[in-house]
Amino acid sequence: MNLEDRQALGELDARLRTMLPEEYQDSYEALQPVPMRSAGLKYGPDGKVAWDEIWGSFCDLAMAGGPPHKGALLEAGTRTAIAARPARYAEVTAELRRGVEMVTELPTELSPTPGWIRVTCLNETMARWLLRAIVMENVAVRREHHMLDLPAAPDFRLDKEIKNVVTVIAKTCHYWLGHTPRAQQRAIGDLFRAMDDESPAVEPAVVEDSGREAVEALAARIAERIATETGLASSARRYDGWLGLECPAERTAIWLMRALVASNVLSRREGTVLFVPVNPAGDPEGDTVVRSVGRACRIAVARGLL
């Protein structure tokens, strides 16, 4: 490993230590993605789910190397699906809002964009940290200032997708509010601002039908450049705003995912497939993503991960 890559590795490690709750700061390299048994639903005297009584503990954060809550990305409903079942969509969003408010004590409302509910965080740093943590749990999420949008769809089921969304916001808020001291939260805010000065955050594009062709074309160009530079082939798995890259092992995908998030590039994984964002507005030619993946892969090779 040359001097430049050693310095880059040291910086990535320092950033991850800053972002992770204290109990993970000295153990995240060795953490294994072992899932916990899913908690069942509990009901109150009114017959409704008692969301705030379900969890006694949570599995490890995906950010720290734990298993993502969802094996595949949980996405928001489409305008067409919502328009076809408005009554059911209203039921789903009402239950999502009730559950989120019970487990986080944060206010919620319907997002201005159909397919999402909006959660108001305590400040922008909290929203930015939760954004990264939730993406890594494989649940779609968007941020506007100190507000987060979480996915909703008329086909969401109480014991499946609704529970998934409530669980993920409960889990990530638990680690932010209960395991991240105020001084560390301030340090995380400083880190985010420093990373923005270096390179603005790259998030997946919000894809409308009219812009899908441009996003897919950019994804193809990014995939070709990454394959040439790193040897990582693109995955057949497709999601709007994401490009999948095949990694040789789960350990490799986890390491690259964290390295990218520490480089201000949102990332997640599904098994051994690493997903990186595609955003024609925020990263028009994909240069930031390609550069960040290339640097992370060089360090991974030097560490024997690739």
Question: Where does each model-flagged region fall?
Answer:
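Short charge-dense sequence patches
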Residues: G40-K48, G77-P86, P112-E124, E203-E213, ...
